[in-house]
Structure formats: C-alpha cells, structure tokens
C-alpha cells in the first residue's frame, strides 16, 4: 500500500480514539471548554447515558461567527499561540483537538453568540472532508454544544459502550470532580429530562464545606482535616480524612487537582499514601480532596492524551512538599505532647558556621550570640527548619502548620538558639597563620588532587582523604552530641533480630552522633541524621551501617564515626578550585592536627629541585 495522506475525517477519528473513550470523555472536554470561556453556569443534559444526546450549555463569552468554522477544525485553539504559552498553560484545554475529534464520531452542532453580536450562529461539520456549514440561529450570549448519536459511524467503538446506567455514572463522576474544582460555577446535570445533580455556586469559603458534603458525603465531611500549606511557589489546600476513622466507603474519595486541573497522578497519590502509612491498615487507602498550586512553568501537562497526568520538573520537591503538608495536619490531629524534659534545645544551623556541624577541640570558641527568633512564615506552614532552609529535593524545610499552642512552643524552642550561655571550653592558643595552613592552592590535578605551594615547597594533597578526615571530625561528638537533622521522609527498613539487637545496644551512641531512630517488631525507622549525611543515599548507607554494627561486639562513637566517614560518598566527583579552597579552610579550622602531622595518604611532597637539576644538566 503506498504512503498517502489520510482523509480529515479518518484522521480525526483516529485522534478521537485517544481523546473520546466514552460519553464521559465528551462531557469532560466540553465542560472544560465552557470553564475556559469564563462560564459561571453550565447545564449538562444527557439522554440514554450519553449515547443518544449530550448537550452542554453555558453562559460564557461565546465564539464569534468568523471563528466558528475554525472551532471545529483540528489544531485550532484560542488558548495558546507560541511555545512559551505551551510551557505555562493555565487553561484546561490547549490542543484544539476535542471538537474536531468529537464531531468526527458523532453529529455535533455548535451554536454560539458573543455579547457584541446581535444574533447567534450555528455550525456543524459533515461529509468526508468535514466541511463546516454556518447558519443563523436563536441563542443567548454563550455557547451550546449538542452531540447526537455518539459513535454512530464507528460501530466497533459503540459496541464497547456499557449500559446506560454505567455510562451515566461515569458522567456523574466527572461532574463531581469538576464541581470540586470550581466552587464558583453552578453545574446542573440532567438525565432523560430529570434533574439529577444541582451544584450551586458558592462565593464564600465557609460555604465550600456545604458543597464538599453534598459531593463527598457527610461521613467524609465529619472526618475531614483541613490543610493549608505553602512554601515558595507551592501551595497545598484541601481536606484529608482522618486515617484512624477511614472506612471502605471513604477510600473511594481520592480527588487531587493541579492548578485547577483534575489529576490521577501517581506521584501525588504516593506522597499522600506515605504520609498516612503509619495510621492506615494494609488494605486501606487514604481519602482526600487536595488542590496543589504550582508555577505553570514547573509542570508539564502535555504528557497524556486526556490530560489525566502531569510531569513535574522537580518531582522530588513536589512529592516531599505534599508529604510534609499532609503529615503535619495528621500529626496535629494526634494531639501528642512533645516531651520537653527529654529534648534539649537545638541550635539553628547556620551554613557559614562549620563548627556547628561537628566538633572542634582546637579552635577558639566563638562568642555567644543573642537568641534569634525563627523567621516568620508567610503561611502557617512556611517556617524553615534545621537545614538552613535549603530547598533541595532531599531535604525540604521542616515546618509544621497550625500546631496547637503547646506543640508550637516546643517547636519554636527547637528552632531558636538557646538563650543560656554555653559552657565555656578551654581556650586553646591562637593558631599560627603560617604553621597551621596547608598553603595556597595552585591548581587541581587529576580531578581529585590539589597542588599546593607553601613556604617555597610544592605538595600534592588528596582531596577525598581530606574530606574523609573532615567528615570524621564533624561526626565525632565533643562535650555535646552532634546536632541531629530531622528527615523530611523517615527511612523505614526491615531488620533481622541480630541487627535489631545491635541497634538497641548502640542507640545511645548513635544518638550522640545525631542518628535517631525508632524500632518495632521487624522494622527500624530512621528519624534524623547528622548534617553531613543529609545529602547521602541513606537507603544504601544506613543498611550498610546496620550490618557493620551487627558484626561488632563492642561499640565506640569514634569507631562508628570513622566507619561512616570512610563510607560516605563524596559530594564532588570532580573538584574545582573553589571547592578545594573551601575544604582546606574547613580542615585547617576543624582539624589543625592534620596540618602539623599529616597522616599517610594525605600529602605527598613534589621534588622540584630534582626536576630543575635534571633540566639544567640537559
């Protein structure tokens, strides 16, 4: 068969196979067009489950007479005009395929009038080439779309349609989802001439619960916990049912929206499921109605034919944000009091202060600073936590919105610098700027060695070895334990009986190293780790650490810190000059003994005199 261009009707029918799955798909596409047109009222009339008639009538802005023919053409849309528009979609539709696809598998009539026009116009496409005919009609401002005899010309598709009741139930579910997305729009759904659903527009926030109860039912409303959580350009609002009282009927309520677009996104569902994991049974599912607002540039909606899924550019960031938002409201509901007497106030981590990250027995202690209040969040869920507000995929700022008064006081105590003066440490003699320095970094050799010049000599320093010694110094506790950094997503691991026994024996020592965990019958949950481990792959490192502990008969913090320092992955596969200079500055400050007596494998002198003499003799 030779290559040939498909007829327009056949091409549209192929496209309809992706967009128009059943009558509910038609209703979704047409109602979304009405919402994009600014409609505040949409009437949906269905006959015989949508197989005979689907009529969508709205009071939107309407379509001009000159654009009616284009409205039924493929790839014709008013939503986007350039790639920049596509990368920042705010409308529900944008491809310009829905009307052309629907008209190719049904008898579609489009009637519309704008406020500027004195009369309405009606358009319909017919024939092999889908020629559009336009004629005058009577109609108020807005648009009406009638879809008759869906799949009349594609018997194979019509054969796969279900019963009238089943198809209408799918349409009813679509309208429920849209009603939850747009509280400001009145939606009326009729079937076979009988009004089945009427969702009146609500203007005030206090009335949203009324529509929520009408759609999701009173049991969900009674167990619903309100969420309002924000950080940067991300906002999460909505409701999640208390997992402790979730029933089988409630588990069917799982509605999530991204920028007002209804979604069935696996990433969002996984984040919510993980937040409720400790409170749900093995066969239970969370119930929720959640709305995620995100910068349109950070999400790609053009990845699914029916736009049921999206792709986030920073998926880990979004996952952790949703997880933390849901987890916070569930923790608030438990009303558990944090034991003040058992938790010492933790100083706020300042990235520039390397001493706060580990011990320093050699440098002069800094002057005590005045206590600082934590930064005021924009929302109740916007406070940044112990990781210095680093917005990385592995560590979202730890924040708890809407905490009760007692819990809020405890949380603020954990964030702020203690007002009491620290216990003075023995003051060491001031360091000699020349004797306690590795020298000047000249260049990077081989990607992981620094060429140093000091006092007329040239030396080669191994940066990974220096980094390992720095890690060990940061991990070894001094007079106080190493600062523990709470994990946004606790790491839950299955352990054997021997491994569990070893962890329990070493629990106090691990606590001094900043590693906090909880254990149950067969699992251990890592809750916090020291700062040097925040960017590590803990799913690999922690099981290896547990295996190491299980092989030991005695435990010491120095040995554990040394093992961790030797097994953490370097953050710099290829070192730069700036990274090398920063590392050496930290090593000179935290480990000055390495400058006085470098251990093996750290420094290697370069004999320039022999090289110079060899050149002179040539």
From Swiss-Prot:
Which family does the similarity line name?
Belongs to the DNA mismatch repair MutL/HexB family.
Q: Where is this region: Disordered?
A: 367-402
Gene Ontology molecular functions = ATP binding; ATP hydrolysis activity; ATP-dependent DNA damage sensor activity; mismatched DNA binding
Q: What is this protein called?
A: DNA mismatch repair protein MutL
Describe its function.
This protein is involved in the repair of mismatches in DNA. It is required for dam-dependent methyl-directed DNA mismatch repair. May act as a 'molecular matchmaker', a protein that promotes the formation of a stable complex between two or more DNA-binding proteins in an ATP-dependent manner without itself being part of a final effector complex.
Q: Where is the composition biased (Gly residues)?
A: 382-392
- PROSITE patterns given for it? DNA_MISMATCH_REPAIR_1
Report the source organism: Salmonella paratyphi C (strain RKS4594)
Identify the PANTHER family for this entry: DNA MISMATCH REPAIR PROTEIN MLH, PMS, MUTL, DNA MISMATCH REPAIR PROTEIN MLH1
